[in-house]
Each structure stands twice: as C-alpha cells, then as structure tokens.
C-alpha cells in the first residue's frame, strides 16, 4: 500500500499570467515577449514590489521575476526540469562527492568585467552564508578555484540534486568586484551577467531594465523592460485592456474568466511548484497526535476550494512538492471520509471534537479558503 502524506490539505496552484498578443510565455519574458510587436519597451505588472534585487537576500516571486532577467546561474532547467548548461559549459564528476564545472569563456558582467572562477567561488560561498537561501545549497562543503575557468565543488555526501539546486534563481553568479564595492547597497544597484542590466528602481512603483548588448547569448530583441508594482488585480487587468501593460501576473477570480476568452490576449497557465496548505504546530496538543492530523486530512475535500476559490486553476496535491519537482513521489491522496475522520478523533480522545482557530492573513484567496475549511471541519 502506498504511504499517505500526513499534510492536511495541499493544492498545486497554476501559474497564471496574461500577455498581449504577440508576446511570449518563456520564463525570460523580457528577452522574447514583444519581439514581434515592434515595441522597444515591454511593461510587466505584478501584485507586489520586489523585496530585493540581491538574489541571495530573498526568495519571493516578485523579486525573482525581475532578477532572472539580470542574472544567470551555473545551471538552468529545461521545460521538463532537466538540468542544462548555463554559465557552466560542461561538468564532470570524478567521484560521488565532487563535481568540476568548466565555465564559459568571454561572459561579461554588466560592469564590463569578464566572469571568472573566482566570481563563482565568491557567489556560492556568499549564498551559503546567506540565511535566506543557504538551505538551497545545504550539503556543499567546499568551493575551489582550479583555474580562471574551472571550479571544483565538493559535498559532504553524494548529492543527487546538486545540479538542480545550482539552477535555482537565487543561486545567481555575481561579480565579486561589483558586489564588494556596493556593499549593503548591492540589492538596490545590482550587477549581473543576464540579458538585461539594471537602470533604476522607484520603490513601490517600478523597476526599469535595459538590454545588455554584450550578453553572451546575444542582445535581447526588446530594448527596455519595466516591471510595475500594481497591487490591485483589477487595475492590472484594466492596464492590460487599455494597452498600458503588456504582461500581467497574479490573475485570479473574475478577471481570469473575463480575459481568457478575449482574443487580444494569451492566457499562459501551467503548474507551479507552490502550494496552498493548512499547517499546524505539531509540537502542541492536540496537533501533536498523528491521529488528530489524519482525522483533519480525511475531513477535507479540496475540490470545492479549487473550483470556488481558484476557479479551477489548481489540482489536489499529494505532497508538499509538485510533480515537476525533482524527488516527487506519486503517493496516494487523501479523499474526504467524514466517518473515518470522526473515528480517528475518537481514538485520539476527542469523541466530541474540539474547538480550533484557523489563522489567515488579509489575502482574499486564503480567507475564502479558510471559510470553506471551517465548514468542512465542523462536520467532525
């Protein structure tokens, strides 16, 4: 029998963003979207401002969408999640705990300096020391420069996911010189080796980038990319309709329904690795009892949440990671069984149930999800 995962409720969300016709849905939107429209500026709106443009300082979506235009990594992932060469042109594994990367020659940072192995060593060691992203590189215990274009990375034990982890958007390769000179201000004036270089950041409003003519994969076809911070979803939708915006992210509810049949736009929708879930403190009673947690899992039906709150833009999950993530195991999902849930609660010492609180923030999606969960949990 397949082992069931003990998380209460998880939903794999769909990535949603809309582009005006002629754009592209590649993950480097700025490098491709709008290339066939004749425009020299692409305006992208998302629902929150970036936290930092320093890739080692935060791991949030609004920041990452901008930073992926500014920086490159040693590795990239293709559409199937398979590691592909990026700044590392090739690699070899002399043993199970060592990987040697051979770097591309002639890669320029936005300050004009050539990328060298010393920059890679500096960047990986900086990420390892950063509280926000160090967990991504857990297991790496050494980075050594062999020559200007060769780096050796060693791990404490065999690490199957190391190439995938080095492709993470936060594990960007920085210019040691530019980063050191900028100090704490690097996140507001970043220097990378990506297709776009930083121009300005009007906090709370917009980040402006321009194409880097010396990019190692060739200059991007759209000269300028502007990331707008537009908190209200309706205002993002209106901006797309009026032509003020070319791409909008974070689309939910009626706006999705309204726009997806409009032939002027392309809705790009696909599975994300993020989850919406109900969590609890397993060190405190009654949630320290596995039978209580399992009872709650059996009490929940994810379908009404997906259909009502997410308007179908999601699917029930059986794990805290999605099927497009390395290491995913296709284990059996929980399905709602009220009688079984009641029996488990009784076995745990709560034949009449117990009172509980669901804490949520002001996000309407989470609030609406909590209301449905409240109704379902009342049944046990």
Regions found by a protein language model. Give the residues of each.
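N-terminal lobe/hinge region of extracytoplasmic solute-binding protein
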Residues: 45-94, 125, 191
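A bilobed periplasmic-binding-protein/Venus flytrap-type ligand-binding module shared by bacterial periplasmic
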Residues: 210-213, 272-295, 299
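Gly/Pro-rich hinge or "lid" segments in bacterial periplasmic/extracellular proteins
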Residues: 82, 167-219, 224, 339
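Surface-exposed binding/hinge segments that line
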Residues: 92, 96, 135-178
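Append "and occasionally in soluble cytosolic enzymes with long acidic Gly/Pro-rich linkers
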Residues: 288-375, 379-380
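Ligand-site clamp/hinge motif
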Residues: 212-257
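A structural "hinge/loop" feature
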Residues: 48-64, 87, 113, 157, ...
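Aromatic- and charge-enriched surface segment that lines or borders ligand/interaction sites
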Residues: 89-130, 146, 152
């Amino acid at each position: 029998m397949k082992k069931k995962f003990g998380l209460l409720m998880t939903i794999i969300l769909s990535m949603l963003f809309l582009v005006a016709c002629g754009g592209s849905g590649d993950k480097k939107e700025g490098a491709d979207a709008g290339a066939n429209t004749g425009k020299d500026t692409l305006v992208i709106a998302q629902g929150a401002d970036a936290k930092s443009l320093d890739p080692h300082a935060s791991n949030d979506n609004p920041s990452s969408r901008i930073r992926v235009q500014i920086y490159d990594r040693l590795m990239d992932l293709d559409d199937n999640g398979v590691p592909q060469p990026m700044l590392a042109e090739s690699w070899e594994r002399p043993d199970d705990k060592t990987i040697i990367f051979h770097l591309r020659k002639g890669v320029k940072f936005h300050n004009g300096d050539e990328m060298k192995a010393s920059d890679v060593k500096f960047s990986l060691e900086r990420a390892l020391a950063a509280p926000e992203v160090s967990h991504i590189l857990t297991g790496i215990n050494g980075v050594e420069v062999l020559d200007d274009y060769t780096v050796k990375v060693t791990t404490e034990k065999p690490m199957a996911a190391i190439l995938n982890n080095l492709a993470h958007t936060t594990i960007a390769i920085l210019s040691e010189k530019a980063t050191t000179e900028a100090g704490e201000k690097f996140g507001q004036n970043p220097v990378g080796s990506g297709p776009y270089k930083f121009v300005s950041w009007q906090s709370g409003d917009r980040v402006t980038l321009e194409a880097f003519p010396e990019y190692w994969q060739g200059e991007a076809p759209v000269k300028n990319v502007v990331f707008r911070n537009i908190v209200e979803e309706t205002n993002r939708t209106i901006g797309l309709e009026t032509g003020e915006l070319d791409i909008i992210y974070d689309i939910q509810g009626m706006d999705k329904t309204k726009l997806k049949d409009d032939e002027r736009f392309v809705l790009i929708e696909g599975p994300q690795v993020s989850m919406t879930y109900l969590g609890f403190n397993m060190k405190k009673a009654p949630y320290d009892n596995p039978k209580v947690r399992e009872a709650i899992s059996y009490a929940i039906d994810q379908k009404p949440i997906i259909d009502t709150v997410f308007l179908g833009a999601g699917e029930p999950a059986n794990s805290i990671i999605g099927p497009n993530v390395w290491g995913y195991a296709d284990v059996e999902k929980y399905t709602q069984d009220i009688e079984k849930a009641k029996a488990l609660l009784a076995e745990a010492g709560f034949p009449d149930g117990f009172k509980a609180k669901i804490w949520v923030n002001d996000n309407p999606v989470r609030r609406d999800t909590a209301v449905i969960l409240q109704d379902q949990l009342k049944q046990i």
